[in-house]
């Protein structure tokens, strides 16, 4: 009875002085403990969500499971130091979970990636060949039917995809190994009607070819070198593209002839320079040039007005009649032949000509008939 009376008296005193009772203190402790547990569980659920989102890039052996971690409960013993230590331990565990482990790629993954890239390049190669074949068929139909509405647009439509693949540096070896340059050669070849491909196709493909590490074996396998040489010699190719083709040919032929691209290894031909010989040659050339100029001036002086006018109009003119004087008479080297023909007088041999006799007889007959 005394104990109960003391409890009641304590409760009454606490109520009187505004102090919390023992029951209220216990309830408050349980509420604090519940809040701490709920907050820890909420943090663990967030970490579990983060861990599951990163599972695609991690191996199965390195996966972390939040559910396996023990949940630290906080008691209502009022020990602040112990509570802070457990909280720090939980935070340390969560920091370890947040650290993303390095992804380890196995050899099998690398082989799968190479196989995927090879298949991608081979599919693009087939698409390029089909597009070129369709354009050729379209041009052949246009030549046969004469219908100018038939336009070959397959290669132009596929061009952006081709250029995007050719410009990727990480695909350079795959492109060369799968002989995609053969399809590039087909695209650059002249069309059945003798015309060249679209200028956009020429410009884009030559720019992409320039960035590829093409070697001699790749040129032999694809046949691209012949088409590039054609572009260096054709007069229908744009000037900048022709110069780019010349540069590519020079770069590709350098390892074939054993030439180095280092300027220090460049061989410069040298020869001795004779100053006196150069002066004599220059004087002789100047004398010849003066003689030619003088002859040209004399020729202009002797031309008639008609010839000068024709020369100004860049026309041909009939040569003017001139009188030629000879200082020395030619000497005959033909021996005198003794004949029975009378050589005295001008036209003395006409009477001995049979043709002349026949003409005279005809003239005489015509006079008699009159």
UniProtKB/Swiss-Prot annotation:
| GO molecular function terms noted in the UniProt entry | chromatin binding; RNA polymerase II complex binding; RNA polymerase II-specific DNA-binding transcription factor binding
Here the segments flagged for biased composition (Polar residues) are 1-12, 62-71
Q: Which GO annotations describe the biological process of this protein?
A: nucleosome assembly; poly(A)+ mRNA export from nucleus; regulation of transcription by RNA polymerase II; regulation of transcription elongation by RNA polymerase II
User: One GO CC term of this entry?
Assistant: RNA polymerase II, core complex
Report residue spans for region: Disordered: 1-86
Biased composition annotated in UniProt, kind: Gly residues:
75-85
Q: Which InterPro entries does this UniProt record tie to the protein?
A: RNAPII_TF_IWS1, TFIIS/LEDGF_dom_sf, TFIIS_N
Carries keyword Magnesium? no
Name its cellular compartments. Answer: Nucleus
Recorded protein name is Transcription factor IWS1
């Amino acid at each position: 009875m005394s104990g109960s009376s003391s409890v009641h008296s304590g409760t009454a005193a606490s109520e009187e002085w505004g102090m919390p009772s023992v029951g209220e203190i216990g309830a408050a402790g349980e509420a604090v403990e519940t809040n701490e547990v709920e907050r820890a569980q909420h943090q663990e659920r967030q970490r579990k969500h983060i861990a599951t989102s990163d599972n695609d890039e991690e191996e199965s052996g390195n996966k972390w499971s939040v559910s396996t971690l023990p949940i630290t409960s906080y008691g209502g013993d009022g020990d602040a130091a112990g509570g802070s230590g457990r909280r720090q331990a939980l935070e340390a565990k969560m920091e370890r979970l947040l650290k993303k482990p390095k992804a380890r790629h196995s050899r099998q993954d690398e082989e799968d990636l190479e196989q995927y890239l090879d298949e991608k390049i081979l599919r693009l190669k087939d698409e390029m060949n089909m597009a070129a074949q369709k354009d050729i068929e379209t041009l052949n139909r246009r030549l046969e039917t004469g219908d100018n509405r038939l336009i070959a647009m397959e290669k132009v439509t596929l061009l952006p995809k081709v250029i995007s693949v050719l410009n990727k540096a990480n695909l350079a070896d795959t492109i060369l190994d799968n002989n995609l340059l053969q399809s590039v050669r087909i695209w650059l070849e002249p069309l059945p009607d003798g015309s060249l491909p679209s200028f956009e196709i020429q410009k884009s493909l030559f720019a992409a070819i320039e960035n590829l590490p093409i070697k001699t074996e790749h040129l032999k396998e694809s046949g691209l070198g012949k088409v590039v040489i054609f572009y260096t010699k054709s007069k229908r190719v744009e000037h900048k593209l022709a110069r780019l083709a010349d540069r590519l040919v020079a770069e590709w032929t350098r390892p074939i002839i054993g030439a180095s691209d280092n300027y220090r290894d460049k061989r410069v031909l040298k020869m001795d320079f004779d100053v006196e010989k150069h002066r004599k040659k220059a004087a002789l050339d100047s004398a010849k040039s003066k003689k030619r100029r003088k002859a040209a001036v004399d020729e202009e002086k002797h031309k008639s007005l008609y010839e000068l006018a024709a020369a100004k109009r860049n026309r041909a003119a009939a040569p003017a009649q001139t009188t030629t004087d000879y200082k020395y008479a030619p000497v005959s080297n033909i021996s005198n032949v003794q004949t029975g023909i009378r050589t005295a007088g001008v036209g003395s041999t006409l009477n001995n000509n049979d043709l002349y006799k026949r003409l005279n007889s005809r003239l005489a007959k015509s006079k008699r008939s009159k």
